[in-house]
Amino acid sequence: MEKIGIDTAFAEPGVRLSINLRERCRMHDLNEALDDLRAVIPYAHGGSVRKLSKIATLLLAKNHIIMQAKAIEELSILVSQLKRKSENLENLNKSLKPDAN
């Protein structure tokens, strides 16, 4: 009995061409997505600055997301503190106002 390996399936030129085309499309889509990501993350975009590598792009994006999450958390804490101060001032203001009766 003849053993059929994976390489036999790739022997047909049409199959190999189809696989190659699919891989080229996949890589094109990946590179386009990375270019889109590079366009929105903050880094030097000057003409003399080299394009970021794939890994550098992903790491920079990850760090940017972490920084944004921390900023949101800090702002949320500040908003809570300001709300409490505002409520305290309103209560103080109410307690200092003479009754209208």
UniProtKB/Swiss-Prot annotation:
Start and end residues of each stretch annotated as Helix-loop-helix motif: 28-68
Keyword check for Protein biosynthesis: no
Tree of life domain: Eukaryota
Subcellular location: Nucleus
GO molecular function: DNA-binding transcription factor activity, RNA polymerase II-specific; E-box binding; protein dimerization activity
Alphabetized InterPro entries for the sequence: bHLH_dom (IPR011598), bHLH_transcription_factors (IPR050359), HLH_DNA-bd_sf (IPR036638)
Tissue expression remark: Expressed in neuronal tissues of the head, including sheath cells of the cephalic sensilla (CEPsh) glia.
Sequence ranges assigned to domain bHLH in this UniProt record: 14-68
Chain residue ranges for the region called Basic motif: 14-27
UniProt KW keywords: DNA-binding, Nucleus, Transcription, Transcription regulation
GO annotation terms (biological process): axon development; positive regulation of synaptic transmission, dopaminergic; positive regulation of transcription by RNA polymerase II; sensory organ development
Purpose of the protein: Probable transcription factor that regulates the expression of dopamine receptors dop-1, dop-2 and dop-3 and thus dopamine-dependent behaviors. May act redundantly with hlh-31 and hlh-32 to regulate ventral CEPsh glia functions. May play a role in chemotactic responses in larvae.
Matches recorded under PANTHER family: BASIC HELIX-LOOP-HELIX PROTEIN NEUROGENIN-RELATED (PTHR19290), GH17679P (PTHR19290:SF104)
Name of this chain's protein: Helix-loop-helix protein 17
Lineage, highest ranks first: Eukaryota, Metazoa, Ecdysozoa, Nematoda, Chromadorea
